[in-house]
Structures are given as structure tokens and as C-alpha cells.
Regions:
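Sequence context surrounding c-type heme c attachment/ligation sites in exported
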Residues: 6-129
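Cleavable N-terminal signal peptides
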Residues: 2-3
Length: 129
């Protein structure tokens, strides 16, 4: 992959920064959506979708034991399932762009297509905070 020239530490920092950015972006998606500013919300949804695709390649084998990672060993033990969840999260953000404007329940729709994936990943693949 294109990350071959990065150090383990750099890879961990990059993936943590991306997850962190997605979280702050998700909060902005929620805010814009609740104000019915759907154009801004959709731009951010697409940004998040792209980030999830990038994240799939940021968990190479050699980064599993990095002291600073919050990722659990289950990421590598269940790599197929983890990658599938990242892909689902990415695809759900794209689906969200097409359903959010007509959603009866904006919060519920965001929960279904966005927050539920965050929760699924944190529950299974991230250390408790």
C-alpha cells in the first residue's frame, strides 16, 4: 500500500487524527442537519465517507502492538469484519446524503446511518474510555 514509507508511529497518529476528525465532523453534520442546512451537511458526509475508505489501509499488521494505539487486537483478529464495518460506514454516509432531507426524524436518521457505526466500531474495536 501507499503507507509503506510511513513509520508505525506515523500511521497510528494519522488514523487517530482521521477518527478524531470524523467525530468532530459528525457533530457538525448533526448541527447542520438539525438546522436544515443540508448542503453543508452533505459536503461533510461525503468527506467522512472518504475518510472511512482511507482508514481501511491504516491498520497494517505491524501497527498492532504500538503502545499508543487505542485499537484493540480484535481489529487484526477480525480484519475482514473490521474492513467491512469501515466500508459500511463509508457507504452509509453516502446513503445519508440522499435520505436526510426527507427524513421525518433527523436525529433517528443520523443515528441509523452515522452514529450507530461509530458505536459498533468503538464497542468492538476500541479500548474503553
Amino acid at each position: 500500500s501507499s503507507n509503506a514509507e510511513l513509520t508505525v508511529e506515523e500511521i497510528v497518529k494519522i488514523r487517530q487524527a482521521l477518527f478524531s476528525k470524523n467525530y468532530s465532523t459528525a457533530k457538525r453534520v448533526q448541527s447542520f442537519s438539525s438546522k436544515e442546512d443540508f448542503e453543508k451537511a452533505k459536503k461533510l458526509m461525503i468527506e467522512m465517507s472518504e475518510n472511512y475508505k482511507v482508514l481501511i489501509d491504516l491498520f497494517p499488521e505491524n501497527t498492532e502492538d504500538e503502545f499508543d494505539t487505542e485499537a484493540l487486537p480484535t481489529v487484526w483478529e477480525e480484519k475482514g469484519a473490521f474492513n467491512a464495518l469501515m466500508t459500511k460506514a463509508s457507504e452509509d454516509m453516502i446513503k445519508l446524503t440522499s435520505v436526510i432531507e426527507d427524513a421525518e426524524d433527523i436525529r433517528g436518521t443520523l443515528k441509523q446511518f452515522m452514529w450507530s457505526n461509530c458505536k459498533a466500531c468503538h464497542t468492538r474495536y476500541r479500548e474503553e474510555h
